[in-house]
Design a protein with these regions (language model features):
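Transmembrane alpha-helical segments of polytopic membrane transport and secretion proteins
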Residues: 1-40, 299-310
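Cytoplasmic-entry segments and transmembrane alpha-helices of multi-pass inner-membrane transporters
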Residues: 33, 108-147, 310
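Transmembrane alpha-helix signature in integral membrane proteins
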Residues: 87-115
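Generic hydrophobic transmembrane alpha-helix motif, especially the helices
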Residues: 133-175
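Glycine/proline-centered hinge or cleavage motifs at structural transition points of membrane proteins
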Residues: 139, 204-205, 218
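Transmembrane alpha-helices
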Residues: 185-186, 208-243
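C-terminal transmembrane helix and the adjacent membrane-cytosol boundary/short C-terminal tail
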Residues: 187-191, 195, 202, 271-310
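Interhelical loop and adjacent transmembrane-helix boundary motif
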Residues: 242-289
Length: 310
C-alpha cells in the first residue's frame, strides 16, 4: 500500500509539473504572438501614416492648380514669375523609362535565372550569383556615377548627339539596377518547382530544354511575375542614379534629350521649395505613391487569380 501511495504521489507531482510547463509555454506563446501582432500593426500604421501625410500635404496644391492642369499640363516652371505646374512630362518619362528598363532587364534576368537554376555548373553558378549579389549591393549613386562618366559619353559618341544625358541613358542604368531583383526572385521560383514535374516530363520523351520552358517556367509563372513587378517598383522609385544620367530637365520624353522623372522632380527641388511649389512636390510624391500602390494591387490581383485557378 505504501508503495502504491508513493507511486501515486510521484505521478501527481509529475502531472502538476506538466500542467505548469504547459501553462508557461502557453504564456510564452501568447507573448510571442502579441509581439508579432504589434510588429504587424507597426508596419500597417507606418503605411497608413505615410498615406495620410502625402494626402494631406498633396491635395491642397491639386485643388489650387486643378487636377487636369496638374496631371495633363505640359509645362513645369515652378520658379517663374507666372509659375506653371504641369507634370505630364514627368509622368510620361517615368512610364517610358520604367517600361523600357523592364523590357530590357526582364529577358536578361529571366534567362539568367533559367540558366542558373537548370543549366549552369556549380562553379559558374557560384560566380554568377556572387556577381548578382554584388550588383544588388552597389549604392544607387555609384550606378549614377558610372553612368555619368562612362555611359553618357558613350551615347554621345555613338549617336552623335550634343549631350548623352537623356531617357536612353536612364533606361540602360535602370535596366541594370532591376536585374538583381528579377534574377533572384525568378531563381527562387524556378527552384521551388517540384522535381517530380520535370522527371515526369523527361520520362515522356521531352528534351531538357522543352521541360524547362514548357513545365518548369509555367509552374513558376507567379514567382516570375512577382519578380517583374518588383523590378517595376525598383525602377519607378529610383531617383539618385536617374538624376545623374537623365539631364533633369522638364522636357517631354525623348531618348536623346534631357528629361525629368517623378522621383527626380521631387529630389531636385524639395531642398529650396516653399509655398505652392513645395505643395506641388508633395502632390508629385502622392502621384508616385499611387503608382506604386496600383502596381502592388495588380500583383496581388494576379497572384490571387492564379491561386484560384490552381
Amino acid at each position: 500500500m505504501q508503495g502504491a501511495g508513493l507511486v501515486f504521489q510521484v505521478c501527481s507531482r509529475l502531472i502538476i509539473k506538466g500542467e505548469k510547463m504547459k501553462s508557461r509555454q502557453k504564456v510564452f506563446e501568447n507573448i510571442i504572438h502579441g509581439i508579432f501582432l504589434i510588429l504587424g500593426l507597426v508596419a500597417v500604421a507606418a503605411v497608413l501614416l505615410i498615406s495620410v501625410y502625402l494626402i494631406v500635404s498633396g491635395i491642397p496644391a491639386i485643388r489650387k492648380i486643378g487636377l487636369v492642369n496638374f496631371l495633363f499640363g505640359k509645362e513645369w516652371q515652378s520658379t517663374a514669375a507666372d509659375p506653371k505646374y504641369g507634370i505630364l512630362p514627368f509622368i510620361l518619362t517615368s512610364v517610358y523609362g520604367t517600361a523600357g528598363a523592364v523590357l530590357v532587364g526582364t529577358p536578361i534576368g529571366f534567362f539568367t535565372a533559367v540558366f542558373l537554376a537548370k543549366v549552369a555548373p556549380k562553379g559558374v553558378r557560384r560566380v554568377v550569383e556572387s556577381a548578382v549579389g554584388l550588383l544588388a549591393g552597389i549604392p544607387s549613386v555609384v550606378y549614377g556615377l558610372v553612368g555619368m562618366l562612362v555611359l553618357v559619353p558613350a551615347i554621345r559618341s555613338i549617336f552623335g548627339v550634343a549631350d548623352g544625358s537623356g531617357l536612353l541613358a536612364a533606361i540602360i542604368v535602370l535596366a541594370i539596377m532591376v536585374l538583381p531583383s528579377i534574377i533572384k526572385v525568378s531563381l527562387n521560383a524556378l527552384e521551388a518547382v517540384p522535381k517530380e514535374y520535370e522527371e515526369a516530363s523527361l520520362s515522356l520523351g521531352a528534351t531538357p530544354i522543352e521541360t524547362y520552358f514548357r513545365v518548369s517556367v509555367p509552374a513558376a509563372k507567379s514567382g516570375i511575375t512577382a519578380a517583374v513587378v518588383l523590378g517595376v517598383g525598383r525602377a519607378i522609385g529610383e531617383a539618385m542614379a536617374v538624376i545623374m544620367v537623365s539631364g533633369n530637365a522638364p522636357n517631354m520624353p525623348s531618348l536623346f534629350e534631357s528629361v525629368r522623372f517623378l522621383t527626380t522632380a521631387v529630389a531636385s527641388e524639395m531642398s529650396y521649395a516653399s509655398g505652392l511649389q513645395r505643395q506641388a512636390l508633395f502632390s508629385i510624391a502622392l502621384v508616385l505613391f499611387l503608382f506604386i500602390m496600383l502596381i502592388n494591387a495588380a500583383l496581388n490581383f494576379f497572384l490571387k487569380g492564379k491561386k484560384e485557378k490552381n
